[in-house]
């Protein structure tokens, strides 16, 4: 059995992930549900060989030393995959996340005009947040693609690993992969400020240093896109501020209130008739919102988003209601994801 055959099968089924796990048959995740492929269980040696074949020496060394490693892998004509190889109680395991080879446009994803407005801001910080596998990378790729088609800018991305590959259209695009082209997010961000970028994408704002540098880049006139694993705008503000020591919190609130342009928190929901659709909470950095951030009144943010509909803001529940009204998702699925389920 060949890994490229398994990955081609997985992509053909529209799977978001392929799971290999010693002692079990291969499995795929389709529309959010994990399903078994009708094949015999794989032994440890088989899984080990399948993943070793596609690793380079550095990745093999990492895997042996740290018992896990991340890398990306491309099957030409099929798709690119983000791979995590690990060890588990029955032996080796690996997960291949499908990255479609084509960047979907905002129109194809059904993203509203507000996403263009958010992308068009000249400088500041735009955060796209949500749990793992909620489509953050897809949303960001569409926003970068829109800019790549409409502006004459330098786009610099720092990713671990590179997911969507952007060709330079109107923009110059440089994509840097952590551990391959740079030692880490903070190192790459530090030198980014000397690389004349207009737009910087930070794949993950994991630690204090990366968040600090991203805020500085946004303050110094760059448009910075970043991702966090938070599930709402309010939690995102708290998360960023909480990373800093007590004596810096007031300063960070002030920096955020100046530079934050938007927080888009998203989740994926099963569509009626198959497939999934993204639902978004959208917060825009209006003077009222900036004030709430500065004065640490994050609890009042939800009602500010509710009343900011004319400015393009929406709560997750407002978005879910719209998707139910369009007949895209069922009431039951909306209720599962809603902040206030009784509204459904």
Indicate residue ranges for each PLM-predicted region.
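Short, flexible helix-loop junctions that flank or precede catalytic/ligand sites
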Residues: 1-344
């Amino acid at each position: 059995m060949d890994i490229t055959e398994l990955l081609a099968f997985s992509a053909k089924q529209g799977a978001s992930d392929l799971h290999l796990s010693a002692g079990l048959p291969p499995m795929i995740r389709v529309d959010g549900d994990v399903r078994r492929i009708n094949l015999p269980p794989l032994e440890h040696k088989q899984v080990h060989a399948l993943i070793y074949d596609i690793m380079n020496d550095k990745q093999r060394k990492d895997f042996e030393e740290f018992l896990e490693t991340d890398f990306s892998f491309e099957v030409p004509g099929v798709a690119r995959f983000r791979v995590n190889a690990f060890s588990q109680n029955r032996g080796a395991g690996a997960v291949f996340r499908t990255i479609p080879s084509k960047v979907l446009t905002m129109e194809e994803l059904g993203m509203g005009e507000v996403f263009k407005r958010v992308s068009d801001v000249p400088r500041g910080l735009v955060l796209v947040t949500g749990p793992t596998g909620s489509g953050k990378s897809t949303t960001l790729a569409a926003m970068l693609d829109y800019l790549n088609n409409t502006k004459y800018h330098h786009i610099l991305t720092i990713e671990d690993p590179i997911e969507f590959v952007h060709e330079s259209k109107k923009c110059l695009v440089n994509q840097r992969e952590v551990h391959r082209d740079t030692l880490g997010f903070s190192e790459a961000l530090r030198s980014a400020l000397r690389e004349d970028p207009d737009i910087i994408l930070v794949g993950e704002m994991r630690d204090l240093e990366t968040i600090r540098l991203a805020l500085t880049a946004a303050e110094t006139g760059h448009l910075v896109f970043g991702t966090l694993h938070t599930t709402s705008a309010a939690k995102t503000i708290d998360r960023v501020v909480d990373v800093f020591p007590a004596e810096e919190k007031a300063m960070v609130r002030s920096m955020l209130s100046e530079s934050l342009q938007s927080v888009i928190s998203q989740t994926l929901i099963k569509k009626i008739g198959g497939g999934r659709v993204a639902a978004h909470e959208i917060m825009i950095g209006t003077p009222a919102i900036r004030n709430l951030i500065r004065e640490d009144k994050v609890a009042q943010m939800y009602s500010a988003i509710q009343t900011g509909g004319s400015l393009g803001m929406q709560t997750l529940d407002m978005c879910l209601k719209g998707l139910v009204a369009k007949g895209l998702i069922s009431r039951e699925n909306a209720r599962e994801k809603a902040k206030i389920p009784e509204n459904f």
